């Protein structure tokens, strides 16, 4: 039985909209470098190493280390896996929703690296010995994800929450031709598709198609329903880099990048409810007839593209005795973003004459946001021609992310920017790598982890481990192979908001919370030629 606290829900909904925009900014700002198979196999701990085209986006001075020109291309596969199951709200651990543990996955092909550097020898024995020019494309983020969750529920419903959210909005307005100009699109889709409807003669009070209304005004879920949540995310972020490197006396290596950060992101999710027994969901019509709820499906999709220009500067110092020291700094990126989104909904009853469908228009909006400054340091030690070990530290303060707008949305973005400063802070990233050479072969391994950019986040955030093999011929050809496993932080997802409260505003029937665990395997093969 539900009693609703409308004002509280409106406050929560507004806060959630601001927070979502803040998290979108984080999603588009974070980097999880890929590159060549060699750099990936060694955990991308290349700030002090260089010599590999995968290292150029980490430290621009890396191009100057190799005393030759080279070309590489790296095809790769990503195997993404997710597990989803409900989280119990009770002390005894019982699950009133999403009780089934569901596994899902997807496989994507990509090209995380391609590039070429041209080395010019000045024929000097000291001073400026070599100059390198390069163009490299390296992948810096992968959004691939597939989620599927399913289970039974006998207490709450997506459509009940939607009905509460719609309270106070006139049905005549929700059904108007220009409804999408004045009301939340999700609510308009819900009403026009038949997920919610008015009751009791009211024009601004709603009930879900799976709910029953009693004479005393109580509203309850009619019976058991099967609930399904699905999500599919694709896309990635790439850095297109123009590089200049310089070798000074085989002691100091300098480099600079002009980079273009390019991102594409696609998010598509749906929520579905089906009646276990439609007879439990009897709805009386004004004409004296009855209809029975069978199933509904609600879908939301979102796509974004962004691009921005930045500069990065780096240096590598080789003081001797096998020691190498590297450092790099990257300017903030001013990103121009265009995003598109839309909603659709369908409600089906046992008699198709009552079925309803609705589709929103396609939304489009453009804005700018600034990704923060980054800096990294590295130490490495080489064992002659036998191998190397390396370690990197990278720092990025995500509280410096910022939306910018000169239009009428300035107040909205000011609110989001305040949330960003409150929620996010510095992130510390550590990367470690090792390589051991056996003639023309090389054995490699790496590990990395990062702290959370959220100030109050508890638990592990993100880590990865990797290994690989390399082959270098006596001629110009070389090939590298790498595996990397990425382990991401747990996600707790609520498909709809709490809406059943007692007279004091306490939750009496908790809505579903889904625990989503995610990891992926990456397999890369680099083919390269030196000349």
How should these model regions be labeled?
Residues 1-25:
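Bacterial Sec-dependent N-terminal signal peptides
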Residues 9, 66, 266:
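Active-site-proximal flexible loops/turns
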Residues 12-13, 69, 441:
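Alpha-helical transmembrane segments and their juxtamembrane interfaces
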Residues 20-34, 39, 119-531:
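Outer-membrane beta-barrel porins/channels
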Residues 37, 49-58, 64-154, 238:
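Outer-membrane beta-barrel translocator/receptor signature
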């Amino acid at each position: 039985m539900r009693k609703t606290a409308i004002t509280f829900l409106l406050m929560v909904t507004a806060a959630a909209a601001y927070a979502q925009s803040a998290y979108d900014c984080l999603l588009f700002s974070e980097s999880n470098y890929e590159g060549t198979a060699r750099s990936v196999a060694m955990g991308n701990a290349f700030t002090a190493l260089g010599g590999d085209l995968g290292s150029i986006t980490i430290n621009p001075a890396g191009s100057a280390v190799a005393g030759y020109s080279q070309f590489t291309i790296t095809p790769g596969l990503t195997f993404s896996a997710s597990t989803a199951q409900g989280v119990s709200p009770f002390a005894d651990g019982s699950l009133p929703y999403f009780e089934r543990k569901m596994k899902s996955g997807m496989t994507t092909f990509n090209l995380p690296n391609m590039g070429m550097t041209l080395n010019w020898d000045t024929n000097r024995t000291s001073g400026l010995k070599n100059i390198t020019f390069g163009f490299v494309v390296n992948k810096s983020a992968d959004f691939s994800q597939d989620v599927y969750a399913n289970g039974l529920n006998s207490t709450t419903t997506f459509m009940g929450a939607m009905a509460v959210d719609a309270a106070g909005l006139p049905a005549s307005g929700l059904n108007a031709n220009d409804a999408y100009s004045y009301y939340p699109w999700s609510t308009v889709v819900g009403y026009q598709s038949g997920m919610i409807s008015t009751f009791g003669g009211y024009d601004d009070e709603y009930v879900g198609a799976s709910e029953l209304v009693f004479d005393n005004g109580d509203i309850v879920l009619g019976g058991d329903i099967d609930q399904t949540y699905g999500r599919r995310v694709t896309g990635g972020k790439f850095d297109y880099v123009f590089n200049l490197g310089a070798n000074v006396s085989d002691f100091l290596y300098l480099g600079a990048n002009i980079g273009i950060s390019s991102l594409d992101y696609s998010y598509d999710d749906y929520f579905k409810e089906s009646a276990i027994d439609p007879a439990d969901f009897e709805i009386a019509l004004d004409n004296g007839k009855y209809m029975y709820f069978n199933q509904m499906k609600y879908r939301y999709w979102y796509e974004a593209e962004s691009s921005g220009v930045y500069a990065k500067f780096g240096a590598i110092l080789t003081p001797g005795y096998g020691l190498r020291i590297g450092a790099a700094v990257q300017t903030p990126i001013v990103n121009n973003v265009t995003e598109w989104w839309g909603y659709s909904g369908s409600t089906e009853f046992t008699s198709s004459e009552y079925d309803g469908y609705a589709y929103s228009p396609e939304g489009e909006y453009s804005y700018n946001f600034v990704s923060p400054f980054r800096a990294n340091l590295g130490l490495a030690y080489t064992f002659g021609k036998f191998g190397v070990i390396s370690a990197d530290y990278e720092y990025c303060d995500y509280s410096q992310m910022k939306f910018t707008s000169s239009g009428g949305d300035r107040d909205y973005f000011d609110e989001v920017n305040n949330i960003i400063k409150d929620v996010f802070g510095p992130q510390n990233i550590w990367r470690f790598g090792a390589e051991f050479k056996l003639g023309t072969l090389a054995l490699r391994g790496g590990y990395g982890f990062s702290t959370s950019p959220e100030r109050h986040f508890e638990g592990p955030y993100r880590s990865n481990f990797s290994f690989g093999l390399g082959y270098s011929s006596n001629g110009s050809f070389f090939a590298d192979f790498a595996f990397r496993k990425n382990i991401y932080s747990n996600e707790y997802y609520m498909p709809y908001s709490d809406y059943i409260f007692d007279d004091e505003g306490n939750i009496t029937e908790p809505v579903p919370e889904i625990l989503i665990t995610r990891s992926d395997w990456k397999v890369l093969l680099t083919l390269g030629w030196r000349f």
